[in-house]
């Protein structure tokens, strides 16, 4: 858990006091004694694959190619290429089936 100093905004550290643990600021004299167990869990919402690829709008102006869909075997697919790793590695090609009823997505 990360708490911030209300006086200067810096991160507080946990240190051992005389009677209890406490949150203390290294920059200013702010100290907050811990009198009970402090727990707080936050689970971040994971991004959808579409969010990473620019959402539905990213597929509006892409070209199609003769790549068969592995799900419905439609003969064509839309594609776009993105650099997902290091610059010295090849780009990743993302495909979306041209069949509107299928819409399957995969990468190469």
Curated annotation (Swiss-Prot):
Record motif Hairpin, residues: 88-89
Subcellular location(s) of the protein: Nucleus
Keywords: Antiviral defense, DNA-directed RNA polymerase, Immunity, Innate immunity, Metal-binding, Nucleus, Transcription, Zinc, Zinc-finger
One function term, GO molecular function aspect: nucleic acid binding
Zinc finger (C4-type): 5-28
Binding site residues for Zn(2+) 1: 5, 8, 25, 28
PROSITE patterns: RNA_POL_M_15KD (PS01030), ZF_TFIIS_2 (PS51133)
Binding, Zn(2+) 2: 69, 72, 98, 102
GO terms, biological process: defense response to virus; innate immune response; termination of RNA polymerase III transcription
GO CC entries: RNA polymerase III complex
Zinc finger (TFIIS-type): 65-107
UniProt superkingdom: Eukaryota
Main subcellular location: nucleus
Family statement: Belongs to the archaeal RpoM/eukaryotic RPA12/RPB9/RPC11 RNA polymerase family.
Subunit note: Component of the RNA polymerase III complex consisting of 17 subunits: a ten-subunit horseshoe-shaped catalytic core composed of POLR3A/RPC1, POLR3B/RPC2, POLR1C/RPAC1, POLR1D/RPAC2, POLR3K/RPC10, POLR2E/RPABC1, POLR2F/RPABC2, POLR2H/RPABC3, POLR2K/RPABC4 and POLR2L/RPABC5; a mobile stalk composed of two subunits POLR3H/RPC8 and CRCP/RPC9, protruding from the core and functioning primarily in transcription initiation; and additional subunits homologous to general transcription factors of the RNA polymerase II machinery, POLR3C/RPC3-POLR3F/RPC6-POLR3G/RPC7 heterotrimer required for transcription initiation and POLR3D/RPC4-POLR3E/RPC5 heterodimer involved in both transcription initiation and termination.
Domain notes: The TFIIS-type zinc-binding beta-ribbon domain contains an acidic hairpin motif (residues Asp-88, Glu-89) that likely coordinates the nucleophilic water and magnesium to cleave the scissile phosphodiester bond and release the mis-incorporated 5'-ribonucleotides.
Biological role stated in the UniProt entry: Core component of RNA polymerase III (Pol III) which synthesizes small non-coding RNAs using the four ribonucleoside triphosphates as substrates. Can mediate Pol I proofreading of the nascent RNA transcript. Anchors into the Pol III active site to constantly monitor transcription fidelity, cleaves mis-incorporated 5'-ribonucleotides and restarts the transcription process. Once Pol III reaches the poly(dT) termination signal, can induce Pol III clamp opening and transcription termination.
Name of the protein in question: DNA-directed RNA polymerase III subunit RPC10
Organism taxonomic ancestry: Eukaryota, Metazoa, Chordata, Craniata, Vertebrata
Gene this chain is encoded by: POLR3K
